[in-house]
Amino acid sequence: PEDGADSVERSGDHENSPYFAHPDVYNMESTDTLTVLHNFKTMQQTSEWSCGVTAALMVLNWYGKLGDWNEESLAALRHSLDGTELESYPGTTLNQAIDIFNGVGGFDIVSTKDYPDGIWMDDIQGWLAEGKPVMICWNDFGGHWQTIIGYDTMGTENTNDDVFLVADSYDTTDQNQD
């Protein structure tokens, strides 16, 4: 790999980092406060633009539909942005993410387009409880896709201390590239 998080595979890891705890999220199991997708396999993107398709690859793998799909073959399922204000944007828009899952087939897609009043923590908790990963994206700094795979209420009624567990295909910031 020449670019993306995969190009620095684990070079910044510190097993006993004094700054980050490294729970074994892959082997975690749900509890009375934690809902987690047990044994969700993460992947690292191999280019700077491929977070969206890599998030989709992780979801395909979760559902046993990975097959021969890879970053490039999923990217080819996206509609062109030529002639739009995003013409030179290399990443994946929400509509293009929908293209990917429609192209692979066999998915019932739910997106923010289906929720004009917004998606809330209760919605995400519900989908996780049903065993469904939740792809999320934001537009800051050019945009980035991640996949929510867990949610912990921390045993309190207050949502201010709640925690999302997120599979990040560009996982280079916590000294444990998992």
Predicted regions: what is each one?
Residues P1-A5:
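Bacterial Sec-dependent N-terminal signal peptides
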Residues Q44-N61, L86-F101:
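Active-site nucleophilic cysteine motif
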Residues F40-T46, E71:
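Glutamine-centric residue-chemistry signal
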Residues G64-A76:
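Short, well-structured active-site flanking segments
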Residues V8-E15, S50-A55:
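Short, mixed-charge, low-aromatic patches
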Residues R10-S30, L34-N39, S73-D178:
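Conserved active-site-adjacent core of cysteine acyl-enzyme catalytic domains
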